[in-house]
Amino acid sequence: MKLCATSSEPARAAWPLSEPALAYFPDARSASDRDLAAGAYSPGVAMEHIPVLLDRCVELLTPALTRRNPDGRGAVLVDATLGAGGHAHRFLSDLPGLHLIGLDRDPQALQIAGERLAPFGDRVSLVRTRYDGIDDALAQTGVAEVSGFLFDLGVSSMQLDRTERGFSYSADAPLDMRMDSDAPLTAADVVNTFAEKDITRILREFGEERFAARIAKHIVRRRPLNTTGELVELLYDAIPAPARRTGGHPAKRTFQALRIAVNSELDSLRAAVPAALAALETGGRIVVMAYQSLEDRIVKTEFAAATASRTPPGLPVELPGHEPEFVALTRGAERATPEEIERNPRSAPVRLRALEKVAGRPTTARRDAR
């Protein structure tokens, strides 16, 4: 197995490991929303990692990975959100010739996935980076074009299970929320040092919280806040009682907003999807699973642009060379079936979208022409 670092990360020695536990929504993707809404999460209890929509991901990506050889030889799959490696393990097991590049910013996730995928040897390359570091990761691993991309967005249950990471509002822990434990900014930094107007903006834009200004005012008045428990208590005071009785846990939107801000999740996604589309070879495929509307909106917008014709509107026929570069493999966003949700409650809120690249024009040229 090859262990790589991004250009901004020092190379790391081999990772000693422990066993995994992983993956994870309702309609606002707070770290614990998926599991709490499904009644599937208890603080401090490690949960079995059941990869979300695993069979559907295999069904969608395998044709691209077996175009050259039925065993996957010559194909490269990038798992841009490696986590504990559940999806990656299935693809490597099914396709004994496949090479997989796994990306994750969380060193603990890479430790867990590294041990899990160690039996596959040099067919696996792991890179510590955010998923918007795709270009650098491919350069480091010597890969020019990719056969398939898989994105499973959001926070993993592995991160939720580690109470000290501060992602869950169901247990008292330090206000951390960093996906990369070496990153400088924490949720405590945001609530304790940001201006009231900036906290309001974060809660409104990233949490779609209608009481954003009210909550920000309470935060500034009461800070410093150092634990998730202190923040939850404040939110119960800040949000009017009638609103607390509807729409799920009153903390979910604030926790979602802080987590997104701390980890620059949406900016990273906006850069990652176009980079992935540009790196796909003709016949390659991309699958993205999103768990809340902010993520899905970005994916939907990028996919719509990728599947649009460049023929000027009003012409009755498609101009040669102006055909869409990608075709959709799903009709809109697919949801988990009742059977899947019963087997894996965490899949209830997922929205899956997939594309196939059918033309060889550079994606960057298409985007510049918009």
Swiss-Prot record:
One of its GO terms (molecular function) is rRNA (cytosine-N4-)-methyltransferase activity. S-adenosyl-L-methionine binds at residues 85-87, 104, 131, 152, 159. It holds the Pfam family Methyltransf_5. Its main location: cytoplasm. Residues 332-370 are annotated as: Disordered. Belongs to the methyltransferase superfamily. RsmH family. This is Ribosomal RNA small subunit methyltransferase H. It comes from Mycobacterium sp. (strain KMS). The lineage of its organism: Bacteria, Bacillati, Actinomycetota, Actinomycetes, Mycobacteriales. The gene is rsmH.
